[in-house]
């Protein structure tokens, strides 16, 4: 995979999130890998995409009531089948790390790339996810 001139992966599905902003610095020095599943422990569907684009419907699952007002995103989502969706170009700040500090530097979103793996802390990831993570 290659990053094109618009800072998007050439083989990723693009679903741009409004939950991003310009970076103050161009230096990227941190990769943050998270996991997510919506509803928790359930895989497939488009709830993560809806969540990152502020289109989640709280009537679809009781859990969504707790997160409906959050405005978050990541640069990439790698689903269980290894497919990649990009929400924020790499030259912009995705809102994935919240209030954060790494090596005495605050606001990790400012100098990091955020990648979400569809999954949970308790469930092993799929081989396809690891392969896509390596390729990205």
Label every model-predicted segment.
Residues 2-24, 30, 37-135:
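Active-site-adjacent loop/helix surface patches within enzyme catalytic domains
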